[in-house]
Amino acid sequence: MAVGYASGKVILFGEHAVVYGRPAIAVPVTQVQAQAQVEDAERGQGITIVARDLKQTYKLSEAPPDDALRAIVVSTLERIRIGLEQDLTLTVSSTIPVARGLGSGAAVSTAIVRALLEHFDKWLDSRAISDLVFETEKIHHGTPSGIDNTVIAFEKPVYFVKGERMEIFWVQRPFLLVIADTGVQSPTKVAVGDVRRAWEREPVRYEELFDDIGTIAEMGRRAIEQGDIEAMGRLMNENQRLLRLLKVSSPELERLIGAARQGGALGTKLSGAGRGGNMIALVTQETCSRVSMMLRLAGARDVIVTEVS
């Protein structure tokens, strides 16, 4: 049996604006993972996909072309020049909440690629894996930025500009993030589509907002590289203010953001598409427990603490 794993991710700075060519920063979250297992099956069975979390089992040959799991299997086998006439069982599971901004779709696809590579004793570098997953991300998100597949495939903090070479950068001083789940699903495709339509109606205003968010991402990278945690917090708060102006926050997010700030967080913002999903809080060792408690009291469905280093 071959097994592939992939971690989740959060965006620190730059969501939505990254779709329009501005920079964004994202980091892996190793506390949550997707897993894919590939096993040989009985002769003549073909390729069977078992999606445990969705409680679905189906044949690859019967899946529609826009099925994301089918798409990543087909594109991976084509990339490594293996025919589809295989007898395999692919089992997928994940601890990453769906539609919460943690990159669940990209992580599942990445885990599948890695499992298939191991099963067939093939190798692809992180860039090639990222490129394969990006094509599947179009099914999940419509017009993805490419940041999810990049940070998850490379498993490093990344500074990302769409269409340009991704940069892995140095974290001068490890920092703690508390990630809190609103419990509200927020499909990226919907929020990204709404922002695009608003941009089409008011291009000048939205380009200015995207510019401001891009500047924050640039300043955020400098703060991380210099180990200036306090500056990071201020920039996160400003990024959240701009995301409100993009109309991608929500009452559930604002409730958790307020609770985290009350608990002593240095900075707070939504992470991902918004309209639900997750928020992140920058904390110290001293404030981590209190912020986590405040978030739970405010109704967070789940709270994760991760160190970025």
Please place each PLM-identified region on the residue numbering.
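Gly/Ser-rich catalytic/binding loops embedded in alpha/beta enzyme cores
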Residues: 30
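DPxDG-like acidic metal-binding loop motif
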Residues: 102-122
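Short hydrophobic alpha-helices at membrane interfaces in multi-pass membrane enzymes
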Residues: 127-128
